[in-house]
Curated annotation (Swiss-Prot):
EC number: 2.3.1.31
The family this protein is said to belong to: Belongs to the AB hydrolase superfamily. MetX family.
Biological pathway: Amino-acid biosynthesis; L-methionine biosynthesis via de novo pathway; O-acetyl-L-homoserine from L-homoserine: step 1/1
Protein name per Swiss-Prot or TrEMBL: Homoserine O-acetyltransferase
SUPFAM superfamilies linked: alpha/beta-Hydrolases
Keywords: Acyltransferase, Amino-acid biosynthesis, Cytoplasm, Methionine biosynthesis, Transferase
Source superkingdom: Bacteria
NCBIfam families listed in its UniProt record: homoserO_Ac_trn, PRK00175.1
Main location group: cytoplasm
One GO term describing the cellular component: cytoplasm
Reactions catalysed: L-homoserine + acetyl-CoA = O-acetyl-L-homoserine + CoA
Length: 358
């Protein structure tokens, strides 16, 4: 199945939360399973920072949730109709900094406006309206996708029955913002960045590659890296280069990332992570969270080095104090933050029960 596209906000522009407007927003999306006659089995999937609209492929390629989706699996395509779209600001089909600005005929680049999670959610809702879906059985997301799911429950509390938030907190921590700052600086200080207007020249590949290497360390655990590499060295490694195997692994991941992601999108989405505030547009966070009516599943991984257990505990407390019907689960995993993408045995029951409302 090839990704599908639709242009939204072509007659009325989207007003952004931090100011500015966007019109003629292309949205790349994909669907899986079959929408039943009652239209009560639809589930929205919200992807993480560098994800896209295709968590699953049926042609031998691996989607980012490939082993979780299919007939009888946690994301059961025999039972549910799944909708997944690339986020606003992304670079996998939905309008973002690398897209053509209809007013100039050139990529937006530095002219792309600042966006927040609330803007992303508005575009997702417009997509569902286009598809004729007025209610969802559930919304599920991990990491950055969990923030989107949380905001959905606040802004449109009657739109869904269940929320499944995996490895994501209500607020991003100071340490995590610090990691993102270093990653952004690696990109911004690349000589080829040119203020974000690099599309007619050489992209800031070195900076983006370095940023990705740092990001990968926050997604993994020390135990996982120790098991995989330890202090093993490369037979052909250079002293100041990839001398240790773990260094070679990170370099590979950094270079691989260049094949599929745009530096400006990375900057904008990292900042959207930092800026996420569920109370934006409301009196305070308690007022915002008190709007939630959905049954809410929140899953924490004790070895997560990005969204740490303390951050999830704080989120748990805020949600409970706001009267949310919260179901909280916590467990360890060698995979750390990325566990929600790969540790099927740990997540299968929580996802299955969360979607069904059990």
């Amino acid at each position: 199945m090839s990704v599908q596209n639709v242009v939204l906000f072509d007659t009325q522009p989207l007003t952004l939360m931090l100011g500015g407007k966007l019109s003629h927003i292309n949205v790349a999306y994909q669907t899986y399973g079959t929408l039943n006659a009652e239209k009560n089995n639809a589930v929205l999937i919200c992807h993480a920072l560098t994800g896209d609209a295709e968590p699953y492929f049926d042609d031998g390629r691996d989607g980012w949730w490939q082993n979780f989706m299919g007939a009888g699996l946690a994301l059961d395509t025999d039972r549910y109709f799944f909708i997944s779209s690339n986020v606003l600001g992304g670079c996998k089909g939905t309008t973002g900094p690398s897209s053509i600005n209809p007013q100039t005929g050139k990529p937006y680049g530095s002219q792309f406006p600042n966006i927040v999670v609330q803007d992303i959610v508005k575009v997702q809702k417009a997509l569902l309206e286009h598809l004729g879906i007025s209610h969802l059985k559930a919304i599920i997301g991990g990491s950055f996708g969990g923030m989107q799911a949380n905001q959905w429950a606040i802004d449109y509390p009657d739109f869904m029955d269940n929320i499944v938030n995996l490895c994501s907190s209500i607020y991003f921590s100071a340490e995590a913002i610090g990691f993102n700052h270093v990653m952004r600086q690696a990109v911004i200080n690349d000589p080829n960045f040119n203020g974000g207007d690099y599309y007619e020249g050489t992209p800031p590949d070195q900076g983006l590659s370095i940023a990705r290497m740092l990001g990968m360390l926050t997604y993994r655990t020390d135990l996982q890296l120790a098991k995989a590499f330890g202090r093993a060295t490369k037979s052909d490694g250079s002293f100041w280069g990839d001398y240790f195997q773990v260094e070679s692994y990170l370099s590979y991941q950094g270079k691989k990332f260049l094949e599929r992601f745009d530096a400006n999108s990375y900057l904008h989405l990292l900042r959207a992570l930092d800026m996420y505030d569920p109370s934006l547009g409301y009196e305070n966070v308690k007022e915002a969270l008190s709007r939630i009516k959905a049954r809410y599943t929140l899953v924490s991984v004790t070895t997560d080095q990005l969204f740490k257990p303390i951050d999830l505990y704080k989120s748990k407390q805020l949600l409970e104090q706001s009267g949310v019907d919260l179901h909280f689960y916590e467990f360890p995993s060698d995979y750390g933050h990325d566990a929600f993408l790969v540790d099927y045995d740990q997540f299968e029951k929580r996802i299955r029960d969360g979607l069904a409302g059990n």
